[in-house]
A protein has these predicted regions:
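Retroelement reverse transcriptase polymerase core
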Residues: 1-151
Length: 151
């Protein structure tokens, strides 16, 4: 276990999951191609950029998998109840979850790439309406945003 500083001055706990990752059946759920996302956004006039707060940590780990995340440190032995950083399938799991949350809004008013959400509209009013839809969905699904990184 190592603790490393984040850009915002807070700390990130990093666990070495290399052995677990070797034994894990890989989830090949695709991440979106950034050029396809950019094509969708081309020509739009108004944008809001949202950032999921501690993205992976908002996804519950399956109860049967929590014990696999166990680690020991000077203060005891712990296991994650949420998806920790460092698991090989974390990006695919998170992307699948977020796409599920916004499935009816994607390509209509929001594009999602991991924990970065781009809300858009052709007019200021439409962009505000779309932002409201996305924020309501975040509230309904308890998806927290990092207010420091939202624009």
């Amino acid at each position: 276990m190592v603790i490393v500083p984040k850009k915002n001055g807070k700390w990130r706990v990093c666990i070495d999951y290399r052995e677990l990752n070797k034994a894990t059946l890989k989830d090949h759920f695709p991440l979106p191609f950034i050029d396809q996302v950019l094509d969708t956004l081309a020509g739009k006039k108004y944008f809001s950029f949202l950032d999921g707060f501690s993205g992976y940590n908002q996804i519950q780990a399956a109860s049967e998998d929590q014990d696999k995340t166990r680690f020991t440190c000077p203060w005891g032995t712990f296991a994650y109840r949420v998806l920790p950083f460092g698991l090989c399938n974390a990006p695919a799991t998170f992307q699948r979850a977020v796409l599920g949350i916004f499935s009816d809004l994607i390509h209509d008013c929001v594009e999602v790439y991991m924990d970065d959400f781009t809300v858009y509209g052709d007019s200021f009013e439409e962009a505000l309406e779309n932002l409201e839809k996305v924020l309501i969905r975040c509230k309904e699904t308890n998806l927290s945003l990092s207010h420091e990184k939202c624009l």
